[in-house]
Amino acid sequence: MTTLSLVRDGDWQTLLSYLPSEYARLAVEHKQLQTQYGNAKITTAESLLRFILLHAGANLPLLQTVTLIAEAGGPRLSAMRLHMKMRRAAPYLQALVERMTPWRAEARAEQWAGYSMVLIDATTVCGPGATGTDARVHTKLRVADMAIVEAEVTDAHGGETFKRFLFQPGELAIGDRCYCNAGNIAHVVECGADALVRFNGYSLPPLQLAHGGSLDALAASRGLREEGVLDLPVTFEHGDERLRGRFIATRLPRADAEEARKRVRKEHGAQVSPALLESAGFVMLLTTVPRERMTASKCLLAYRLRWQIELQFKRWKSLCGFHRLPNYRDDTIVAWLYAKLLLGVLLDRMSVDRSELSPPVQLEAIPPQARKRRRRRSAAPSEPAVEGHEHPVPDDRGGPAATLSA
């Protein structure tokens, strides 16, 4: 999606066709078109979105954005007025994203042991010159078709929790160790779904074994050999209720375990404990999935799918420029991020419906002589294409597994 695409009328109308049908009504509902004076330049939701998506999608300064649209024959707006519009636009853009994310919810997802697998994670973004996190983008991603089911933008204080999302019966929520606490798991179970998370003994109440006594996760895992799997039924408390689950563990291959210990040493420095270093050599999971529905080995394989959401965040930051926050204001940052999310969902839709955007050439409609000339031209030597550079894009050598420690 180029800068020209967002300015040119033909491309712009194509983009609008992918938006929810009620995008204009939502703009009125969220008071985006209210004005104090009669000479307002932006009077339609279409004009408002054109300014916002050009500003965020092309990473243009405010002044350059309004200048480009004015030169293309659009409304003449001051940079300060666009800034004020951005400050108020976050709720409207959020409503658009919420209506666009479940667009493939009716599709029959590929199921694994009867589950629809959903990945939950968040990525951080920083502003210019920042020394810490300025905002977080929280996402629920369905594995079967890599569709964004839900997304939410918060400031730096918005924690990672399953409670930000609603889950459906038949879903399996997969998250890393920061989601491993009793409240998060209880929320998923209350929705009628199941959870599969990386075990974090520091954030959980003591796990009780079926025969009595508390589980010592490291001691129980210590006797495992490579490729061995431990599967123990456990219970734990959340308020007045007791939840049932399974503790699953396996030992990492020696090379992967050493890499995991290097990461732990780098993160904790001299304060790293021997127990933490030893536990880095294992993958430990906690799940509410019944044993008769999914074996421990299958749960370990399912957790390895979590790396897909990390790749999605990298794609967003690469293609949509998520890592380039425009300024320091919380309100405009949230609006800017929702605009980026909206563009990401639009790209997702367009990639699925690409045949409608670029219909294939019907060879039967081309005269035979023209077909011969076309073949001769394609056989002639020509300048290398843009993609034909000296350094080919490297393969993803991490492979689909990316190790169990991912």
Locate predicted features.
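Short alpha-helical "recognition helix" segments of helix-turn-helix
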Residues: 64-71
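Single, function-defining residue in the core of a domain
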Residues: 1-59, 67, 76-77, 81, ...
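A short structural micro-motif
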Residues: 72, 88-92, 322
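Short, basic alpha-helical nucleic acid-contact segments in DNA-binding proteins
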Residues: 83-105
